[in-house]
Amino acid sequence: TGLGSPTYDTFAAGDHDLNFYLWGGMGGAAMAGLGLALAQPKRRVLVITGDGEMLMGLGALATIACEAPKNLAIAVIDNGHYGETGMQRAHTARGVDLAGIAKASGFKSTTTLQSMASLQRWLPTWNKKAGPVFADIKVSAAPAPMRLPLRDGTAIKYRFRTALLGTDAQK
Protein backbone atom coordinates (compact mmCIF):
# COMPACT_ATOMS: atom_id res chain seq x y z
CA THR A 1 0.00 0.00 0.00
CA GLY A 2 0.95 3.61 -0.38
CA LEU A 3 1.07 5.94 2.56
CA GLY A 4 -1.87 7.45 4.39
CA SER A 5 -5.52 6.53 4.08
CA PRO A 6 -5.08 3.56 1.70
CA THR A 7 -2.76 2.00 4.29
CA TYR A 8 -5.25 2.61 7.11
CA ASP A 9 -8.12 1.25 5.02
CA THR A 10 -6.20 -1.85 3.95
CA PHE A 11 -5.22 -2.57 7.54
CA ALA A 12 -8.80 -2.04 8.73
CA ALA A 13 -10.06 -4.46 6.06
CA GLY A 14 -7.75 -7.17 7.40
CA ASP A 15 -4.07 -7.30 8.17
CA HIS A 16 -2.05 -10.01 6.47
CA ASP A 17 1.63 -10.90 6.48
CA LEU A 18 1.67 -10.31 2.70
CA ASN A 19 0.48 -6.71 3.16
CA PHE A 20 3.47 -4.40 2.78
CA TYR A 21 2.75 -0.96 4.22
CA LEU A 22 5.00 1.54 2.46
CA TRP A 23 5.32 4.25 5.08
CA GLY A 24 6.79 7.55 3.95
CA GLY A 25 7.50 6.71 0.31
CA MET A 26 5.05 9.05 -1.40
CA GLY A 27 4.86 8.28 -5.08
CA GLY A 28 6.64 4.94 -4.77
CA ALA A 29 3.92 2.35 -4.21
CA ALA A 30 3.25 1.62 -7.90
CA MET A 31 6.96 1.16 -8.64
CA ALA A 32 7.41 -1.06 -5.59
CA GLY A 33 4.52 -3.13 -6.91
CA LEU A 34 6.16 -3.32 -10.34
CA GLY A 35 9.37 -4.62 -8.80
CA LEU A 36 7.47 -7.24 -6.83
CA ALA A 37 5.40 -8.28 -9.87
CA LEU A 38 8.54 -8.72 -11.98
CA ALA A 39 10.35 -10.63 -9.23
CA GLN A 40 7.34 -12.87 -8.49
CA PRO A 41 5.67 -13.46 -11.88
CA LYS A 42 3.56 -16.38 -10.60
CA ARG A 43 1.92 -14.24 -7.89
CA ARG A 44 -0.80 -11.65 -8.36
CA VAL A 45 0.24 -8.24 -7.01
CA LEU A 46 -2.30 -5.58 -6.02
CA VAL A 47 -1.05 -2.09 -5.17
CA ILE A 48 -3.53 -0.01 -3.18
CA THR A 49 -2.63 3.66 -3.18
CA GLY A 50 -4.21 7.09 -3.08
CA ASP A 51 -4.84 9.67 -5.76
CA GLY A 52 -2.31 12.11 -4.29
CA GLU A 53 0.43 9.51 -4.27
CA MET A 54 -0.42 8.32 -7.78
CA LEU A 55 -0.32 11.91 -9.02
CA MET A 56 3.12 12.27 -7.47
CA GLY A 57 4.37 9.23 -9.39
CA LEU A 58 2.56 9.48 -12.75
CA GLY A 59 5.68 8.41 -14.62
CA ALA A 60 5.30 5.02 -12.98
CA LEU A 61 2.26 4.34 -15.17
CA ALA A 62 4.32 4.62 -18.36
CA THR A 63 7.09 2.43 -16.92
CA ILE A 64 4.60 -0.20 -15.77
CA ALA A 65 2.88 -0.20 -19.17
CA CYS A 66 6.24 -0.64 -20.94
CA GLU A 67 7.17 -3.57 -18.69
CA ALA A 68 3.60 -4.94 -19.02
CA PRO A 69 3.52 -7.34 -16.08
CA LYS A 70 0.49 -9.58 -16.50
CA ASN A 71 0.25 -10.09 -12.72
CA LEU A 72 0.03 -6.45 -11.56
CA ALA A 73 -3.01 -4.36 -10.67
CA ILE A 74 -3.06 -0.80 -9.33
CA ALA A 75 -6.12 0.31 -7.34
CA VAL A 76 -6.24 4.04 -6.57
CA ILE A 77 -8.50 5.17 -3.75
CA ASP A 78 -9.43 8.59 -5.09
CA ASN A 79 -11.07 11.08 -2.74
CA GLY A 80 -9.96 14.07 -4.81
CA HIS A 81 -7.88 15.45 -1.93
CA TYR A 82 -4.41 15.35 -0.45
CA GLY A 83 -5.51 13.80 2.83
CA GLU A 84 -2.14 13.66 4.53
CA THR A 85 -1.37 17.36 4.11
CA GLY A 86 -4.60 19.09 5.08
CA MET A 87 -7.26 17.97 2.59
CA GLN A 88 -6.34 20.37 -0.21
CA ARG A 89 -8.17 19.60 -3.47
CA ALA A 90 -6.12 17.29 -5.67
CA HIS A 91 -5.94 17.42 -9.45
CA THR A 92 -8.39 14.53 -9.72
CA ALA A 93 -11.02 16.83 -8.18
CA ARG A 94 -10.24 19.26 -11.01
CA GLY A 95 -10.77 16.81 -13.86
CA VAL A 96 -7.53 14.84 -14.17
CA ASP A 97 -8.51 11.31 -15.23
CA LEU A 98 -6.10 8.77 -13.74
CA ALA A 99 -7.70 5.82 -15.56
CA GLY A 100 -7.39 7.78 -18.81
CA ILE A 101 -3.70 8.40 -18.14
CA ALA A 102 -3.18 4.70 -17.38
CA LYS A 103 -4.98 3.76 -20.60
CA ALA A 104 -2.96 6.24 -22.66
CA SER A 105 0.20 4.82 -21.06
CA GLY A 106 -0.70 1.35 -22.32
CA PHE A 107 -2.44 -0.45 -19.44
CA LYS A 108 -4.39 -3.46 -20.73
CA SER A 109 -7.43 -2.85 -18.54
CA THR A 110 -8.54 0.43 -16.97
CA THR A 111 -11.70 1.48 -15.21
CA THR A 112 -13.16 4.20 -13.03
CA LEU A 113 -15.44 2.91 -10.29
CA GLN A 114 -18.02 5.43 -9.09
CA SER A 115 -20.09 3.36 -6.66
CA MET A 116 -19.91 0.59 -4.11
CA ALA A 117 -21.87 -1.62 -6.52
CA SER A 118 -19.30 -1.13 -9.29
CA LEU A 119 -16.48 -1.83 -6.83
CA GLN A 120 -18.18 -5.02 -5.69
CA ARG A 121 -18.49 -6.15 -9.32
CA TRP A 122 -14.81 -5.34 -10.01
CA LEU A 123 -13.27 -6.96 -6.92
CA PRO A 124 -13.76 -10.60 -7.97
CA THR A 125 -12.45 -9.87 -11.48
CA TRP A 126 -9.23 -7.83 -11.10
CA ASN A 127 -7.03 -10.87 -10.54
CA LYS A 128 -8.45 -12.73 -13.54
CA LYS A 129 -7.51 -10.04 -16.07
CA ALA A 130 -4.15 -9.94 -17.81
CA GLY A 131 -2.34 -6.91 -16.54
CA PRO A 132 -1.36 -4.40 -16.05
CA VAL A 133 -4.77 -3.52 -14.61
CA PHE A 134 -5.74 -0.07 -13.29
CA ALA A 135 -8.79 1.01 -11.29
CA ASP A 136 -9.55 4.53 -10.10
CA ILE A 137 -11.94 4.03 -7.19
CA LYS A 138 -13.85 7.23 -6.41
CA VAL A 139 -14.66 7.63 -2.71
CA SER A 140 -16.01 10.33 -0.44
CA ALA A 141 -13.56 12.77 1.11
CA ALA A 142 -15.38 12.46 4.45
CA PRO A 143 -13.04 11.42 7.25
CA ALA A 144 -13.19 7.77 8.24
CA PRO A 145 -11.96 6.19 11.46
CA MET A 146 -8.26 5.36 11.23
CA ARG A 147 -6.73 2.03 12.20
CA LEU A 148 -2.97 2.23 12.07
CA PRO A 149 -0.87 -0.82 11.21
CA LEU A 150 2.60 -1.51 12.46
CA ARG A 151 4.95 1.39 11.65
CA ASP A 152 8.25 -0.45 12.20
CA GLY A 153 9.71 -0.67 8.69
CA THR A 154 12.21 -3.38 9.58
CA ALA A 155 9.55 -5.58 11.18
CA ILE A 156 7.19 -5.05 8.23
CA LYS A 157 9.97 -5.96 5.78
CA TYR A 158 10.90 -9.18 7.57
CA ARG A 159 7.28 -10.20 8.12
CA PHE A 160 6.56 -9.65 4.41
CA ARG A 161 9.72 -11.39 3.18
CA THR A 162 9.07 -14.42 5.37
CA ALA A 163 5.46 -14.68 4.15
CA LEU A 164 6.59 -14.29 0.54
CA LEU A 165 9.76 -16.37 0.50
CA GLY A 166 9.49 -18.65 3.53
CA THR A 167 11.78 -19.04 6.51
CA ASP A 168 14.95 -18.64 4.43
CA ALA A 169 14.07 -14.97 3.91
CA GLN A 170 15.67 -14.09 7.26
CA LYS A 171 19.12 -15.27 6.15
Regions found by a protein language model. Give the residues of each.
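Glycine-rich beta-alpha junction loops
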Residues: L3-T7, N79-H81, K138-P143
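Long, charge-dense
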Residues: I77-M87
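Thiamine diphosphate
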Residues: D9-D78
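Conserved thiamine diphosphate
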Residues: R89-P124
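General beta-strand structural signal in soluble alpha/beta enzymes
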Residues: T1-L3, Y21-L22, V47, T111-Q114, ...
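Short active-site-adjacent structural elements
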Residues: D9-T10, E84-T85, R121-W122, A142-R147
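Glycine/aspartate-rich loop-and-adjacent alpha/beta segment that forms the canonical ThDP
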Residues: A13-H16, K128-K171
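Short acidic loop-to-helix transition motifs that present clustered carboxylates
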Residues: P6, G27-G28, S115-L119
